[in-house]
Amino acid sequence: MDREGLKKVQSERLIETVERVYFNVPYYRHKMQEKGLGPESIRSIDDLGRLPFTTKQDLRDNYPFGLFAVPMSEIVRIHASSGTTGKSTVVGYTRNDISTWSEVMARTLTAAGANRNDFIQIAYGYGLFTGGLGLHYGGEKIGASVIPISGGNTIRQIELMRDFGSTVLACTPSYALYLAEA
């Protein structure tokens, strides 16, 4: 796709997103109206800078579900931050969100060189943190063998690397260094 084609797709998707949040999330509608904006004000990706941006405080102020753009009946999974610096930030996912997330992570793994012959050891936490599950689904989508060990348990991590022949390690850079030194 050439640059103009990409800009066209980005503009179309931005317009759709702005319309969806304007009509489905009262908080965003109010923020846009404060800036004198309506959905018709955004016509291309060039207008992105005119939009109010979401801050962590906005997420906290609308805890837990105030920024969801769909009814709760469409939310199939909820993730949240740990809340170590304040109120947790909450994200709700629809089935389509999960599918898109899986596709994005599959592309990310492929771009990094992973393929169906790999053993992907996921040492990110599972649970409310989003890291482990996204890579898990992305790995399955490319046909790789996923080892969902989660975080911590360093001795077991190293044992499984050796026993299973892990070829991809998904974890934080600091934990990778820690494993290398263990």
Each language-model region and where it sits:
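Nucleotide 5′-phosphate-binding alpha/beta core
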Residues: 1-80, 85-103, 107-111, 116
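Conserved adenylate-forming
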Residues: 16, 27, 35, 133-182
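Short secondary-structure transition/capping segments
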Residues: 42, 53, 117, 158-162, ...
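Short glycine-enriched loops at secondary-structure junctions
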Residues: 75, 98, 125-127, 174
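N-terminal Rossmann-like NAD(P) cofactor-binding module of classical short-chain dehydrogenase/reductase
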Residues: 79, 121, 170
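Small/polar loops that bind or transfer phosphate-bearing groups
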Residues: 93, 123-124, 149, 171
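Conserved AMP-binding loop of ANL adenylate-forming enzymes
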Residues: 110-146
